[in-house]
């Protein structure tokens, strides 16, 4: 969005203008009787806007059974490999025709790199982390960060929990993925939340986005589309995921938007999202409040973490003046 402000990219630009290889993506058209996938060219070009809104067609294998099946048939590495090969999987639908949460924002990262001429981590350090004082954020851990790293834990079907001692993302990723892969602290991420609450300005006064850009990022840009439930296609990574089931939700240029007041007290128009290891945050510009619940537990939508997060949020709203 900083590049949009600067006039260096347009939201309706074809993404291939900046990342030519995205034009090679194909659409999954089903599987034959032997289970072999069939693909076809997309009916239109992918735009920058569609990537930001998760309507370009990219998915995540742990949220889509057909994409997981395709990856198994074609030996496509998981996105956690932070590889270009994982990003070149297949589209789940024609661009602009449906909402599908996936590696769309990873491709946004490639657009940013192409325009800035730098790796995404360097751009984020210069233009987000340093101005906001986020000294514990990055795609690789400093010695200080490593000394304080919380271990990933796995929840068993019986409810027990054990540390995953060998679970660590590569410290030299082939790709800096725009949609995942950062290390950070809750304190650092709350500086980002405060920036959004402060209309683009950090707590020390550094402006990273214009207030009108924050406005644009926090309103529905999906039109009549609504976001959908995310199936848990890889049980070790995610359960089925839907926030406030049955309540209409839309999407802006960064976050999910609840279109009605949530049971916690979060008002219509507030934004929120989550990360796979059961990290959840929300931003309520109307009431000038936001929060984050953070764990290092898999699979996503943990049966204890989600209720705890919702109780936490409700307590916040119950005590607002």
Where are these regions (language model features)?
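Short, well-ordered beta-strand elements
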Residues: 280-282, 288-298
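Short, hydrophobic/aromatic-rich segments at coil-to-beta transitions
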Residues: 264-272
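Short, small/polar residue-rich loop motifs at catalytic or cofactor-binding pockets
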Residues: 275-277
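A short acidic/glycine-rich loop-to-helix N-cap element
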Residues: 298-308
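Short, surface-exposed loop or secondary-structure junction motifs
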Residues: 17-265
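Surface-exposed amphipathic alpha-helical segments
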Residues: 306-321
């Amino acid at each position: 969005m900083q590049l949009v402000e600067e006039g260096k990219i347009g939201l309706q630009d074809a993404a291939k203008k900046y990342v030519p290889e995205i034009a090679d993506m194909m659409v999954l058209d089903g599987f034959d009787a032997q289970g072999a996938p069939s693909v076809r060219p997309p009916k239109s070009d992918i735009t920058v806007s569609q990537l930001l809104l998760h309507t370009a067609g990219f998915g995540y294998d742990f949220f889509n059974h057909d994409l997981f099946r395709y990856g198994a048939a074609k030996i496509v590495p998981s996105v956690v490999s932070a590889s270009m090969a994982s990003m070149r999987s297949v589209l789940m639908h024609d661009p602009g025709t449906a909402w599908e949460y996936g590696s769309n924002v990873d491709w946004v990262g490639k657009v940013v790199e192409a325009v800035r001429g730098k790796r995404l981590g360097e751009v984020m350090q210069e233009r987000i982390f340093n101005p906001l004082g986020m000294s514990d954020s990055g795609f690789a851990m400093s010695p200080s960060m490593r000394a304080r790293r919380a271990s990933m834990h796995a929840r068993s079907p019986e409810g027990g929990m054990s540390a995953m001692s060998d679970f660590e993302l590569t410290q030299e990723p082939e790709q800096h993925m725009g949609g995942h892969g950062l290390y950070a602290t809750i304190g650092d991420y709350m500086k980002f939340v405060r920036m959004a609450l402060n209309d683009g300005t950090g707590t020390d006064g550094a402006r990273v986005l214009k207030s009108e850009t924050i406005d644009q990022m926090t309103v529905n840009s999906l039109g009549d589309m609504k976001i959908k439930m995310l199936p848990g296609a890889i049980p070790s990574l995610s359960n089925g995921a839907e926030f406030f089931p049955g309540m209409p939700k839309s999407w802006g240029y960064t976050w999910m938007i609840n279109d009605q007041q949530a049971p916690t007290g979060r008002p219509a128009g507030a934004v929120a999202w989550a990360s796979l290891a059961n990290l959840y945050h929300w931003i309520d510009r109307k009431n000038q409040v936001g929060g984050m619940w953070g764990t290092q537990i898999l699979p996503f939508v943990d049966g204890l973490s989600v209720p705890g997060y919702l109780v936490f949020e409700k307590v916040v709203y119950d005590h607002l003046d």
